[in-house]
């Protein structure tokens, strides 16, 4: 190659001198850059030394004609370079196409995977929407069920409150009735107490009447002692009175005994009535409780019926809901089957996608390996492409320059009509040069494929040229020939031009390599982000599938729970029916007990009415007895008044006759002798009658006291402390009455003793006075008169006795 270049240089020295006029302006336009293969400082100095004469030689070159043709060796080198660079660029383009196709296939697979993911998402969203709809329907059914439950509970509470209010009102009515009944019972007890008080008053009146009768008998006995004549008739009257009194006392005692027995019976009846009343109260309480229980049972039965109806309705509704739920469950099962199928399909797709992803990962790894290898190839091809592109750009610039020159030539044609021949020749030459340039462009394309070899050959040629240039410089320095200087300058210019071209090609190749590297990095980043998104979507799909499975399991659990609830409701309905039957049986039993208690109440009320009737009869009898006692008291008062009148009349008569018959004391001594016996007899009879009366009174008092003690013992439990004080006062009053009786007996005994003393003194004074027979006659006359008077008084008393009895 070096010999060829030397021969070419020797052959082309003459030609270059003619063609420098065309090349110099081209080379001056190219920007020079420092190269690694640049010459040493000695070479730079030689260049400076050579540049000075080149500046001097420029006008000579400018004066040359620009119509000199280009050398054929350069065109051959360019054609070789283009031919070498073209297959490399084709391979690089094919590799780029393959890489782009792989990237497009990856993007298509990525788009397919994204579409599948979108479809799976859509399916999952549809399944989730279906599940949400099912859950919403279930929630709505549960909310409706809870609302209905709440409404039923509120209605039950309101009904219970109303029934409680009604029961309270009924209880108040029953309490009012009970209060009224208790008030009536209190009135009855008060009436009974009043009756007992009246009985006690009657007993007191009876005792007072007896006391008065005793007083009257004693007074009568005293008057009989004083009145001798009326003693026999008074004895008769006393006997009659005693007989009547005895009869009355016997009748009264019998009545009192009967009344006592009846009172005892009445008290027993009262006790029985009270016990019956207590039992009745207890029965009433039991009946009230039973009524309350009945009402509660009825209410419970009505509630149970209502609840049973409601539960039946609810059971029907629940059955409907169960049917709907079963339908929904079937739909859900169908949808679940479809969803499971879809999930299986999606799972299979996911597995396929995962396998594809693994394959893609492997492919990506392989692609990365290939990309790494291709990067190296790309770097190399980019270097080649850069060189070829630089050359093509330079050729394009040259073509542009040629166009500009053509324009200038055309202008010169218009300006220089005189030089038509030169212009035509120059045009022909330019056309030939055009053809050559076109051929050179075609050859440059071919040379692009062979740029590597040319670069290597150029590098070796550069080294050789540099060595030769050094040698030539040395020779030129020694010789100082101008031809060699021009050749060296031309070589320097060619070397600079080639260096600039290769530097531009390298820069462009580096730039393209950087662009490709950035594109590859961006594709890597996009692929990594796509992988991350893919993994995130895979995780989201897995989570969504898990959530879907959990929701399906929860739906199954809720369906099972609803089935259990329906079973429980059925069991509760059966239990409620059983409770209703039991409540009905209990209600029947309670109704039977209530009927029995009502019958017992009626019987007790009838007995109480009978007892009240008996009490009324006894009260009427008691009132009649009291009325008879009042009549007897009136009779006694009348008899006492008559006795007092008779005694007063007798005393007046005795007082009148005593004055007249002072002289007849002797005649009446016998009578006075008889008077003590009569008085004693009358006193004995009086005492006996009084003792009998007192014994009878004591027996009656004992009976009454026993009856009173029995009644008091029975009534002590029910009486208050005030009643006890009344009893104490009554006993004190009786003791005072007894003491008065004893004092009265003592006083009467003292008066009798004084009368006896007076009689004894009169007997003693009779002999002292010296009564004669005339006095005795007068006494006998007085006795006869007294007898006549006593007879009249007896007849009057006999006449008045039956009248009073009538």
UniProtKB/Swiss-Prot annotation:
List localization entries. Plastid, Chloroplast
Where does it sit, as one GO cellular component term? microtubule associated complex
Biased composition, class Polar residues, residue ranges: 34-59, 759-769
Presequence boundaries: 1-78
Name the UniProt key words of this record, in alphabetical order: Chloroplast, Coiled coil, Plastid, Transit peptide
Biased composition (Basic and acidic residues) is annotated at 391-403, 685-699, 706-725
Coiled-coil stretches? 88-530, 585-662, 698-757
Which residue stretches does the UniProt record annotate as biased composition, category Low complexity?
9-22
Record region (Disordered): 1-94, 380-403, 684-725, 746-777
Family membership: Belongs to the WEB family.
What name does the UniProt record give this protein?
Answer: WEB family protein At3g02930, chloroplastic
């Amino acid at each position: 190659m070096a010999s060829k270049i030397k021969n070419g240089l020797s052959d082309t020295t003459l030609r270059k001198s003619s063609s420098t006029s065309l090349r110099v302006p081209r080379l001056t336009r190219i920007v020079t850059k420092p190269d690694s293969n640049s010459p040493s400082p000695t070479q730079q100095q030689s260049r400076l030394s050579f540049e000075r004469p080149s500046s001097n030689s420029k006008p000579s070159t400018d004066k040359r004609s620009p119509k000199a043709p280009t050398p054929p060796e350069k065109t051959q080198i360019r054609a070789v370079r283009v031919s070498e660079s073209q297959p490399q660029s084709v391979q690089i383009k094919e590799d780029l196409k393959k890489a782009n196709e792989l990237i497009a296939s990856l993007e298509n697979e990525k788009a397919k995977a994204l579409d599948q993911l979108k479809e799976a998402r859509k399916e999952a969203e549809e399944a989730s929407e279906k599940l949400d709809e099912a859950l919403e329907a279930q929630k709505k059914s549960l909310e409706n069920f809870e609302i209905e439950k709440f409404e039923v509970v509120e209605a039950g509470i309101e009904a219970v409150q109303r029934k409680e209010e009604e029961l309270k009102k009924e209880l108040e009515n029953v309490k009012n009735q009970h209060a009224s009944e208790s008030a009536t019972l209190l009135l009855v007890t008060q009436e009974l107490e009043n009756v007992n008080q009246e009985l006690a008053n009657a007993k007191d009146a009876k005792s007072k009447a007896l006391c008065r009768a005793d007083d009257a008998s004693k007074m009568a006995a005293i008057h009989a002692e004083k009145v001798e004549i009326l003693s026999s008739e008074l004895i008769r009257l006393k006997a009659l009175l005693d007989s009547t009194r005895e009869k009355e006392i016997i009748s009264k005692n019998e009545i009192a005994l009967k009344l006592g027995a009846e009172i005892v019976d009445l008290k027993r009846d009262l006790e029985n009535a009270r016990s019956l009343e207590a039992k009745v109260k207890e029965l009433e309480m039991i009946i009230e409780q039973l009524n309350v229980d009945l009402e509660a049972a009825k209410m419970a039965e009505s509630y149970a019926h209502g609840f049973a109806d409601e539960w039946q309705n609810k059971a029907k509704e629940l059955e409907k809901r169960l049917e709907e739920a079963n339908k929904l469950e079937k739909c859900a099962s169908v949808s679940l089957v479809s969803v499971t199928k879809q999930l299986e399909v999606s799972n299979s797709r996911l597995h396929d996608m995962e396998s594809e992803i693994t394959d893609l990962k492997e492919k990506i790894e392989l692609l990365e390996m290939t990309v790494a290898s291709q990067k190296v190839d790309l770097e190399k091809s980019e270097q080649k492409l850069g060189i070829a592109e630089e050359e093509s750009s330079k050729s394009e610039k040259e073509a542009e320059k040629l166009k500009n020159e053509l324009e200038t030539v055309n202008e010169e044609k218009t300006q220089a009509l005189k030089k038509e021949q030169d212009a035509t020749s120059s045009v022909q030459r330019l056309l030939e040069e055009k053809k050559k340039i076109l051929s050179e462009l075609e050859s440059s394309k071919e040379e692009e494929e062979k740029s590597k070899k040319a670069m290597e050959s150029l590098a070796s040629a550069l080294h050789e040229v540099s060595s030769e240039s050094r040698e030539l410089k040395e020779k030129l320095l020694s010789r100082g020939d101008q031809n060699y200087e021009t050749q060296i300058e031309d070589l320097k210019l060619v070397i600079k031009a080639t260096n600039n071209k290769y530097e531009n090609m390298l820069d462009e190749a580096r730039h393209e390599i950087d662009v490709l590297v950035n594109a590859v990095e961006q594709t890597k980043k996009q692929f990594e982000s796509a992988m991350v998104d893919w993994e995130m979507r895979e995780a989201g799909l897995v989570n969504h599938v898990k959530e879907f499975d959990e929701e399906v399991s929860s739906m199954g659990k809720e369906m099972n729970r609803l089935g259990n609830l329906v079973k429980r409701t059925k069991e509760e309905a059966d239990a409620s029916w059983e409770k209703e039957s039991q409540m009905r049986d209990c209600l029947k039993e309670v109704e039977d007990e209530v009927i029995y208690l009502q019958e017992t109440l009626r019987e007790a009320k009838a007995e109480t009415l009978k007892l009240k009737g008996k009490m009324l009869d006894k009260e009427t009898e008691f009132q009649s007895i009291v009325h008879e006692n009042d009549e007897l008291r009136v009779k006694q008062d009348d008899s006492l008044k008559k006795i007092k009148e008779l005694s007063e009349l007798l005393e007046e008569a005795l007082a009148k006759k005593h004055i007249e018959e002072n002289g007849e004391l002797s005649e009446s001594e016998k009578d006075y002798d008889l008077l003590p016996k009569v008085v004693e007899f009358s006193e004995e009879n009086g005492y006996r009658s009084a003792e009998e009366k007192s014994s009878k009174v004591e027996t009656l008092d004992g009976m009454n006291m026993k009856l009173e003690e029995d009644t008091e013992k029975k009534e002590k439990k029910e009486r208050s402390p005030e009643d006890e004080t009344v009893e104490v006062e009554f006993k004190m009053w009786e003791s005072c009455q007894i003491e008065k009786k004893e004092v009265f007996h003592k006083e009467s005994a003292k008066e009798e003793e004084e009368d006896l003393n007076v009689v004894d003194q009169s007997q003693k004074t009779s002999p002292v006075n010296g009564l004669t027979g005339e006095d005795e006659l007068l006494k006998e006359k007085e006795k006869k008169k007294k007898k006549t008077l006593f007879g009249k008084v007896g007849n009057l008393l006999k006449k008045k006795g039956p009248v009073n009895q009538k």
